[in-house]
Amino acid sequence: PDVNIIGTIATGLPNITSSKSNASGDKVDRTIAYVILLAASASQLNPSLDPSSGLKVAAMPVYTAASQLCIDELFEKVEQNKLTRNKTLKPDYRKVYGKLLAAIGYPTRALKSPLFVGTGERDIDVPPKSQLALVREACDAGTKVEAHLYAGLDHSGTVNPSFKDSITFARKVLAGQPINVQCDPTPQ
């Protein structure tokens, strides 16, 4: 459709294709809930896809529960089962689920209009490292990005404090004024 997008505002920006996480492969990582949801979605789209081709045995109870739980409950289930990346993912996970990962990823990092990104420094739902990697990729692709890193805030806690900055960004974009390009934010 013909939509004139003049700017984009995002907080807690997911970067599903990033390998950057705050957790090592041996630490319990609640963001594995998203990976398991992706695997469950892939199986719904392609019932012949065997989840055990990409997920290890330890992840299967959480995988089985994924279609019945909301994300917060799934986070708890991941923590209860002490799932780490090493306990959850088989080495060829990205190969098995590659088509789905590509389909839900961003088609380009080069946006024609400016992008505002608000990231909580202590976000455990969408790791700041992966969000900031996406910011850097967008900047490198030529997108005008105004990124903010909010000190001490988590995923949900970032939304309201970011309004001051995102509203200023929106007003500038609507008025045709340049934004404050910031590709490497420091905690504020």
Give residue ranges: language-model regions.
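Conserved hydrolase catalytic core segment
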Residues: 1-6
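Extended hydrophobic secondary-structure segments that form protein cores and membrane-embedded regions
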Residues: 7-13, 117, 149-150
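Accessory cap/linker subdomain of secreted extracellular hydrolases
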Residues: 11-107
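C-terminal catalytic histidine-bearing segment of alpha/beta-hydrolase fold enzymes
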Residues: 22, 93, 98-99, 132-188
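A structural signal for short secondary-structure junctions
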Residues: 107-111, 141-142
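Short beta-strand/loop motif that positions the catalytic acidic residue
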Residues: 111, 116-123
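Acidic catalytic loop of the alpha/beta-hydrolase fold
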Residues: 121-126, 155-156
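The serine-hydrolase catalytic nucleophile loop
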Residues: 129
